[in-house]
Each structure stands twice: as structure tokens, then as C-alpha cells.
Amino acid sequence: VTAELSSIIDFIRYGASRFSAAGLTFGHSHDNPIDEATHLVLAALHLPPDLPPAYGAGKLVAEERERVLGLIERRVSERVPVAYLVGEAWFAGLKFKSDRRALVPRSPIAELIESGFAPWLDHRHVERALDLCTGSGCIGIAMAEYNPDWQVDIVDISPEALSLARENIVFQHVEDRVEAIQSDLFAGLAGRRYDLIVSNPPYVTEDEYAALPGEYSHEPKLGLTSGEDGLDLCLRMLDEAADYLTDDGLLIVEVGESERALAKLLPEVPFVWIEFKVGAMGVFALERRDLIEHAKAIRAAAQARR
């Protein structure tokens, strides 16, 4: 069958058919087999994602055919995410290096970045921002790209993830505005305060992790799980964040499917669950003053995990 394939669009169609027939999971950057196959084929050929349709008729040479077919086969047989196969992923319209040192870039927070965090920052002045649990660095670097007057710190406990994040800082040419810091949450940030703290921390429960499709087994578990209910790290963050926020500071955190568990655990805390184009995505916003007002309940919940 593959001998009959010749054009770029042929290989995209073939890849999409193989992915669909194999029942692959599309949770890393794409949600369907056609976009997944398009990403794989174009990246493997070193072509841009917005390639004009006319180029789809272009023919692959023998070496390119072999490379693309090999990647399609690995995507199916090994369940490796496309971003890892081709070494790149897109987030908030920006290209990032991606490999097994950190999770594949993905978060609804990209939509917030692209919209200027409207309406959350409409009446706030931001000079310093923090991306906590940065992984590949995608959130913090994207914040700096979209807001050239911000200074952004990106933090992770994993030296492997930070090495990738530092490569992405250079890749996006934001060395003068983004600093990568290895730290267990706020431990290495003494004396620093931020107008905005954004985080996509690990929040997958142990039961959820055990049931995840094979694609997720290629990602570092440290970046996915956080205790039995997925909230261990989030609670520590809530307990400590006020000390690192400016007086009018804002905290935005993604907790995904752990949203209900968090709301149930801290019912008196006025989490504002942000609505995205596709609806709620388990991302909350919380003012520093609310963290202070409910500090006792938050600390009790956090200390119960220690």
C-alpha cells in the first residue's frame, strides 16, 4: 500500500487513517488524527504548519518517505506522542522544543495568554510574572513573548525539565526577559514577589494515572501525578503563594479534573473557575487577598498532606 503513496497529502491521509484505525489517543496538542498526522508529516519534512495547500501535491523523495513512514509506524506501535517523535510542539502559536525531559506543551492557559489574560489583567500593572512547575517552559516563555515589558521567572524542581526550558528560552530569544530557576515550588524564590503567578502543576490522581492511555507513559510521571487526589502540590502552592504575590497579585492555576475535589475540600475559598471557548477546563483564578483571608483553612488542608 505504501508504495502507492507519493505526495505530502498522501502521507498525511495515510497517517490519519493508520492513527484512526489503531485507536490512538489524541491528548497531546491535537484532538483528532488528521491534525496529528499533519503535524507529524510536515515537521518530519521540516515544513511550516501553515504550508500553503498547493504544496500538498509535492512529492517525497525516497529518504523522506522512509523517515515519515518510520515515524508513523512508531506513533502506532509504540504510542509515542508526535511531539516527541519530531522534537517540537506548538503552544500559544509558538514553536517549542519537546522531548521526554518534560511534558508535551499543552494547557488551556494558552488561550489566556493569547487573549492578554482578559479580563483578569484589565486594571492591573504587571512587571514580574512567575510560571511555577514550568516543565518545557512553554507558559512562561509564551507570557514573555506576548508581553515584552514583563520579566518572567520559570521554575521547576526537575533539572531535566529545566534544561529543556533553558533551551527553549534560547530558541525563542527571550534570554533577557526570562530566568529559569530550579526550585521546589517557592523554596528557591526568597525575596521575590510577583504581580502574576501562573501554574500548570501535576494534578493527575493515582487512579487516573493507572488508567491513562499508553501515550502518557512516555512522559515523566513527576510532571503528571500529585498524590492520591492530585492536589498535594496545588495545596502547597495555595498555602505559600501569598508571600510571593504583590498586594494586588493574582494566582492562576490549572487543576483539570481535580476541580471538584478542590472545591469540595475548600468550599469557603472563592475560586473563580475560568470559562474558555470550549467551556470550563479546571483553571481557577484567586486574588492574594482571598488567599490571606482563607489562609487558616488552606494551611490546615495543606498540612494534612505533610
Model-derived segments and their meaning:
Residues 46-47, 102-103, 203:
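Active-site/binding-pocket entry motifs
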Residues 112-115, 146-306:
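S-adenosylmethionine
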Residues 12, 37-38, 68, 136, ...:
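A general structural signal for well-ordered alpha-helical segments in protein cores
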Residues 54-56, 60-62, 66-148, 157-164:
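SAM-dependent Rossmann-like transferase core, predominantly class I methyltransferases
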Residues 22-27, 116-124, 245:
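Alpha-helix termini
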Residues 5, 34, 61-65, 103-106, ...:
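Short, solvent-exposed loop/helix junctions and linker helices
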Residues 2-92:
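N-terminal auxiliary segments of SAM/dcSAM-dependent transferases
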